[in-house]
């Protein structure tokens, strides 16, 4: 995806406020060997771009002063109640340096799985994006998770996902295989399963 940015000469609260009134959004691009650069972007164009998933999770082409620079979206500040972007941060991308980014997970095939189609389970995603690290050229816009083989007894953890070549998941904490979805049986089936469980043997009375 490509967007157009312009150099911003002034900074500060007052200058940023005047910029927003004129229909522009203030921002900054940093990283790499160049100095941080203040920029401004047409607010409407930026607002519509931010609605697209790929704008958040892929390498972008930023056109500035007739030159195109590869960047990543790093931070967006929104107004608390207006539909307005207050500030946006981009980071320059070095093609020889690994990038660390959150990539969306696309869950596919769940409606045709045995868990849903036959057993009537409710399948709920627990994780919607994944921290990954890879070279810029290998960064995927999203990662597909195939749920077509799910049953009510399935477990779907991170290690069940086939990551694209060169992409490594970054997992924090001791659990290296976090669950990606929860699988819940219909209440009627769950109640029947519980009722069919053998009752606990009564405790023996002590001798008098």
Curated annotation (Swiss-Prot):
Sorted alphabetically, which Pfam families does this protein's record hold?
Ribosomal_L25p (PF01386), Ribosomal_TL5_C (PF14693)
- Alphabetized UniProt keyword annotations: Ribonucleoprotein, Ribosomal protein, RNA-binding, rRNA-binding
Q: Which GO terms describe its cellular component?
A: cytosolic large ribosomal subunit
Provide any one GO MF term from the record: structural constituent of ribosome
Q: Does the keyword RNA-binding apply?
A: yes
Q: What does the entry give for GO biological process?
A: translation
InterPro entries associated with the record = Rbsml_bL25/Gln-tRNA_synth_N (IPR020056), Ribosomal_bL25/Gln-tRNA_synth (IPR011035), Ribosomal_bL25_b-dom (IPR020057), Ribosomal_bL25_C (IPR037121), Ribosomal_bL25_long (IPR001021), Ribosomal_bL25_short (IPR020055), Ribosomal_L25_dom (IPR029751), Ribosomal_uL5_bac-type (IPR020930)
Top-rank taxon: Bacteria
Keyword Lyase tagged: no
What is the role of this chain? This is one of the proteins that binds to the 5S RNA in the ribosome where it forms part of the central protuberance.
Matching PANTHER family: RIBOSOMAL PROTEIN L25/GLN-TRNA SYNTHETASE, ANTI-CODON-BINDING DOMAIN-CONTAINING PROTEIN, RIBOSOMAL PROTEIN L25_GLN-TRNA SYNTHETASE, ANTI-CODON-BINDING DOMAIN-CONTAINING PROTEIN
For this chain, the family text in UniProt reads: Belongs to the bacterial ribosomal protein bL25 family. CTC subfamily.
Q: How does it assemble?
A: Part of the 50S ribosomal subunit; part of the 5S rRNA/L5/L18/L25 subcomplex. Contacts the 5S rRNA. Binds to the 5S rRNA independently of L5 and L18.
Name assigned to this protein: Large ribosomal subunit protein bL25
> What is the scientific name of the source organism?
Acidovorax ebreus (strain TPSY) (Diaphorobacter sp. (strain TPSY))
